Amino acid sequence: MSFADFLLIETVIYLFFALPACYSDVRKLLIPLRFVLLGFVVLTAAKLYLLHRYSANPRFFQHSMLNLLIAAATSALLYFCVRVFSAGGLGVGDIFFGVYTAVYCGFYKNLVAAAFAALSGILFYLAAAVAKKIRKRILEKSGQTEFVHRGIFVIPFVPFITFGAVLAVFLF
């Protein structure tokens, strides 16, 4: 079994659980934690099985397991700190999903994935803010006004984490 086969199996498992979480986050701003935790267990078990079955070197297996543990712990800490410093702008589901993503990516790629997720989230937020401002100007010129005043809008972050993870895994 080649590295490409490992990568394909891991990616299919990751996306099987990530895409419904993305959909739920976009539609309801809720992340199904049971589904994410089930994905975490399935992906971890698949990685353990594949690494144990096909790695000839026991030290490689140990190194890979240590990499997964460090990746999960670092991801939990990173997303928790973002949650604290953003005054709850990031939900608990995003933290759990970040840990799930860390198991998929590994330590180094997870850091790259988090950077890609943050960058794509910021770009989306800026584009949405510009679109909102343009819409407001068009309504003002036509004599209409928005009846509902909305504060700063909330963006679902799980799709950006997923995008960043897949991009990081396939680029690095």
Region spans (language model):
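A membrane-topology feature that recognizes alpha-helical transmembrane segments
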Residues: 1-172
